[in-house]
From Swiss-Prot:
It comes from Legionella pneumophila (strain Corby). This is Aspartate--tRNA(Asp/Asn) ligase. Its EC number is 6.1.1.23. ATP binds at residues 219-221, 228, 485, 537-540. PANTHER family: ASPARTATE--TRNA LIGASE, MITOCHONDRIAL, ASPARTYL/LYSYL-TRNA SYNTHETASE.
């Protein structure tokens, strides 16, 4: 039907007859001449219809926004003064000789241009119109290019793209499963996979030593800007490797992706930071290194002070006291300070102490803070020295259990960085390594894996693991880009006894382990090779590469914050016949007043 995409029409096409197909993006009447901007996925092209050809001109007069047309004409140079360098085709136009209306459109609920601010629910209800916008076309095209880069790179590295089941068994992976009832097996359910974790490990035990898959995963969890109930990840597993092999593989992949998509050259080797250092300096296991602010421990300086908030946390083995210096922060008003104090309570903090350094040379008289009366001059001076305070700075403090301090002050660090425009431009990629094997659940006080229960400890000894589980480090690693966790992985346990030990430590007894993971434990007995892998979030990576604020902007048909789809009205009720066939009876609806 067409000879060219719109953007392919240029000065090399002058005096040639071309045919394009697309939508009427804009129609303008000027002095009896009709100008059309025709849009396809590649861009815009101006077409001119003159009144001499009355039959074709009459058709052009009927056109409205979003009509679908087929246009034929002769390419000519635009007259001087009408060149539009903002358009890729802005130096040429087409003198229309033929025009066919392929379909009509009523006035759409919004026009697919990039100049309107459109309600998100409306965008998703009419997503097929929203996706016509140039910005959305570019984002999804870039996502395609990202996937192509990944496939080409891994294929060249001798990886095999192998599919794994979508209907599988529910396994505890940290989030709720989406369950699918079985008609053939009444009362029993499949689960949609949260990841292909166990299947890719089984593939390594099957002799396929390099596997990858760009795969859909499902998690029934509360949504955020970077979460969806269904999401896409690059899943990788390799046998007969160590951590260094995987880190080098991903560094090579990211180097190609950034070069081909953004024309940015990444270093051959990315920086690495231990989990402990990341939490100590930034209060986060995914620190944004573009932000210059850091947390500084001061517990040793306030152990004996009269301010109980500080001294009690400083003398608690599970407590922490930190300072966070904000350069030139003295211009913050009392209301600003109160707002930041309210902000940290979201993360469990009971409040936010601060000291304003109005004049460093004036000693205590040059400081402003409600807590100064509880601190000795020596303690205050020691704090100022440690944080290298200057006149005009404000110093915030966090004192509580370490996990509360890390979460609240880490979040405050991020907020201050954005509020005060401290975030440097560019890209900061980082490996976070040497993760703890386990953490204690604050509510149950039971051990739980930091990643998942199939992660190998650095010391391959069941006895050592049992004797000091909270001190054991894992062979685990996360890749962080500009403060976003883009992927994580680990070396896996390949010895059945060690796997049973991990299950036992996290409260999964032999019977439960056999019921949930019997197939894995059986496979581990039949010569499982050392293996490991990683998974990268395609949605998050595409979000960053397109400078989007949400992964919903790089997914063709996303769910809303409430996990619903305005376009299809999913989820929706099931019919009684379907429920009866599946042997399901719904519980009475519970209403609350």
């Amino acid at each position: 039907m067409r000879t060219h995409y719109c953007s392919a029409v240029n000065e090399l096409s002058l005096d040639k007859q071309i045919t394009v197909c697309g939508w009427v993006h804009n129609r303008r009447d000027h002095g009896g001449v009709i100008f059309l901007d025709i849009r396809d996925r590649s861009g815009l092209l101006q077409v001119v219809y003159e009144p001499e050809n009355k039959e074709i001109f009459a058709i052009a007069e009927k056109l409205r926004s979003e009509f679908v047309v087929r246009v034929t004409g002769i390419v000519r140079k635009r007259p001087e003064g009408m060149i539009n360098d903002k358009m890729e085709t802005g130096r040429v136009e087409v003198i229309g000789t033929q025009l066919e209306i392929l379909n009509q459109s009523p006035t759409p609920p919004f026009l697919p241009d990039d100049h309107q601010i459109i309600n998100e629910d409306l965008r998703y209800k009419y997503r097929y119109i929203d996706l016509r916008r140039a910005v959305m076309q570019k984002k999804l095209t870039l996502r395609h290019k990202l996937n192509s880069c990944i496939r080409n790179y891994l294929n060249e590295q001798n990886f095999l793209d192998i599919e794994t089941p979508m209907l599988t068994k529910a396994t505890p992976e940290g989030a709720r499963d989406y369950l699918v009832p079985s008609r053939v097996h009444p009362g029993q359910f499949y689960a949609l996979p949260q990841s292909p974790q166990l299947f890719k490990q089984l593939l390594m035990m099957s002799g396929f030593d390099k596997y990858y898959q760009i795969v859909r995963c499902f998690r029934d969890e509360d949504l955020r800007a970077d979460r969806q109930p269904e999401f896409t990840q690059l899943d990788i597993e390799m046998a007969f490797i160590n951590e260094e092999d995987i880190l080098q593989l991903i560094e090579g992949l990211l180097k190609i992706v950034f070069k081909e998509i953004l024309n940015i050259t990444l270093p051959d080797k990315l920086p690495r930071m231990s989990y402990k250092e990341a939490m100590t300096r930034y209060g986060s296991d995914k620190p944004d290194l573009r932000n210059p602010l850091e947390l500084i421990d001061i517990a040793d300086l306030v152990k004996d002070c009269d301010f109980n908030v500080f001294s009690s946390a400083a003398n608690d083995n599970s407590g922490r006291v930190v300072a966070l210096k904000l350069p030139n922060g003295c211009d913050l008003s009392r209301k600003d300070l109160d707002n930041y104090g309210q902000f940290v309570t979201i993360y469990g903090a009971k409040g936010l102490a601060y000291i304003k350094v109005n004049d460093l040379s004036a000693g205590m008289a040059g400081l402003q803070s409600p807590i100064l009366k509880f601190l000795s001059e020596t303690a205050v001076q020691s704090i100022l020295n440690r944080v290298e305070a200057q006149t005009g700075d404000v110093i915030f403090f966090g004192a509580d259990k370490a996990h509360v301090v890390n979460e609240s002050m880490g979040a405050l660090r991020n907020k201050l960085g954005h509020d005060r425009n401290l975030i440097n431009s560019g890209w900061q990629l980082l490996w976070v390594v040497d993760w703890p094997m386990f953490e204690l659940d604050p509510q149950s006080n039971k051990l739980q894996p930091m990643h998942h229960p199939f992660t190998s400890p650095q010391e391959l000894s069941a006895e050592a693991l049992r004797s000091k589980p909270t001190q054991t480090l894992a062979k685990a690693y996360d890749i962080v880009i500009n403060g976003y966790e883009i992927g994580g992985g680990s070396i896996r346990i390949h010895q059945p006894e060690l796997q049973k030990t991990v299950f036992d430590l996290i409260g999964i007894g032999d019977q439960e382990a056999h019921e949930k993971f019997g197939f894995l434990l059986d496979a581990l007995q039949y010569g499982a090779p050392p293996h490991g892998g990683i998974a990268l979030g395609i949605d998050r990576l595409a979000m960053l590469l397109t400078d989007s604020t949400s992964i919903r902007d790089v997914i063709a048909f996303p769910k809303t914050q409430t996990a619903s789809c305005p376009l299809t009205s999913a989820p929706s009720p099931a019919g009684n016949a379907q429920l009866t066939e599946l042997g399901i009876r719904l519980a009475p609806t519970i209403t609350t007043k």
